[in-house]
């Protein structure tokens, strides 16, 4: 559990899936190898939707139209996306850091753009410089998104993202 859950750096309201897609499209071009986005929230909160929208946006910018499946059963999906490979990991079914180490995710944190669902499973492997997006479903089907940046690169991404969101 992220110690900043109760005190995010910023909170956004995403009224519908289109707003989630738009946010993902804004963030996608800013990401580079070594960037990590940690996606938190309950099942159905919007983590996978956001990750898939971001990956699609990154691939579309390269003229690619690939299927972007959920990594729920494969645990990790990778995509060649120009200058940086993208790793989309869903750690829900893993029990802890030792299984994550076997996947090679620790190395990917340095060499790829990493989108990680259920980052609480990372334990001590959690990157110190990461942008955390905490999704929460609201009663009206909108999403409340808490954002927290830990580290200088994540802080720069958050500033740019909020500037583009008009926050």
Model-derived features with residue positions:
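N-terminal pre-Walker A segment at the start of P-loop NTPase domains
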Residues: 2-24
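Hydrophobic anchor at the beta1->P-loop junction of P-loop NTPases
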Residues: 37-39
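Conserved nucleotide-sensing/catalytic segment adjacent to the nucleotide-binding pocket
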Residues: 67-117
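Short phosphate-coordinating micro-motif centered on Lys-Gly-acidic
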Residues: 2-3, 10, 96-101, 105-167
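Phosphate-binding P-loop
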Residues: 28-34
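Conserved lysine of the Walker
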Residues: 47
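Post-Walker A helix-loop "phosphate-sensing" segment adjacent to the P-loop in P-loop NTPases
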Residues: 56-67
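P-loop (Walker A) phosphate-binding loop of NTP-binding proteins
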Residues: 42
């Amino acid at each position: 559990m992220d110690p900043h859950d109760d005190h995010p750096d910023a909170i956004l309201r995403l009224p519908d899936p289109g707003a989630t897609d738009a946010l993902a499209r804004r963030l996608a071009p800013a990401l580079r190898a070594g960037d990590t986005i940690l996606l938190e929230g309950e099942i159905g909160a919007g983590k996978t939707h956001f990750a898939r929208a971001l990956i699609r946006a990154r691939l579309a910018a390269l003229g690619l139209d690939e299927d972007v499946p959920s990594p729920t059963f494969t645990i990790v999906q990778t995509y060649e996306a120009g200058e940086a490979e993208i790793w989309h990991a869903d750690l829900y079914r893993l029990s802890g850091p030792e299984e994550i180490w076997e996947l090679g995710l620790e190395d990917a944190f340095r060499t790829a753009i990493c989108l990680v669902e259920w980052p609480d499973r990372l334990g001590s492997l959690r990157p110190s410089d990461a942008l955390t997006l905490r999704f929460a479903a609201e009663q009206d089907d909108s999403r409340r998104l808490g954002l927290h940046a830990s580290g200088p690169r994540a802080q720069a991404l958050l500033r740019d993202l909020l500037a583009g969101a008009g926050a």
